[in-house]
Amino acid sequence: YPPKPENPGDDAAPEELAKYYSALRHYINLITRQRY
């Protein structure tokens, strides 16, 4: 599996959070595509 994106934490900048969530969504898509 690809590495899970790192959570930037509660005091992260909004841009960091947006980047993290888009990376996380991409990561989940990769995993679910491999599984099924």
Swiss-Prot record:
A Gene Ontology biological process term: feeding behavior
Annotated family: Belongs to the NPY family.
Compartment(s) where it occurs, according to its Swiss-Prot or TrEMBL record: Secreted
Matching CDD domains: PAH
Identification of the protein by name: Peptide YY-like
PANTHER family for the chain: NEUROPEPTIDE Y/PANCREATIC HORMONE/PEPTIDE YY (PTHR10533), PEPTIDE YY-RELATED (PTHR10533:SF14)
Native source species: Caliraja rhina
Taxonomic classification: Eukaryota, Metazoa, Chordata, Craniata, Vertebrata
GO cellular component, one term: extracellular space
Record-listed Tyrosine amide modification sites: 36
Record's keyword terms, sorted: Amidation, Hormone, Secreted
